[in-house]
Amino acid sequence: MARVCKVTGKRPMVGNNVSHANNKTKRRFLPNLQYRRFWVESENRWVRMRVSNAALRTIDKVGIDAVLADLRARGEI
């Protein structure tokens, strides 16, 4: 399963672990994804999405209806 946020598109990033001796090994920085249910009043149903915490803040700010409209316009749901 892809670790991708439905709303923001955040994905894992690649970086390095750096030891005290300055040795570098590859690592992944994973987005903080959560499965959340959102009540959509206009459709009278729950919508379950995998979203990042940044997306939760966006949904709080603009509303779930606006976010779903944007996702539908992009053709993602």
From Swiss-Prot:
GO terms for cellular component: cytosolic large ribosomal subunit. It holds the Pfam family Ribosomal_L28. The keyword RNA-binding does not apply. Signal peptide: none annotated. InterPro entries: Ribosomal_bL28, Ribosomal_bL28/bL31-like_sf, Ribosomal_bL28_bact-type, Ribosomal_bL28_sf. Coiled coil: none annotated. GO terms for biological process: translation. GO terms for molecular function: structural constituent of ribosome. Gene3D superfamilies: Ribosomal protein L28/L24. The keyword Calcium does not apply. Keywords: Ribonucleoprotein, Ribosomal protein. Belongs to the bacterial ribosomal protein bL28 family. PANTHER family: 39S RIBOSOMAL PROTEIN L28, MITOCHONDRIAL, LARGE RIBOSOMAL SUBUNIT PROTEIN BL28M. NCBIfam families: L28. This is Large ribosomal subunit protein bL28. The gene is rpmB.
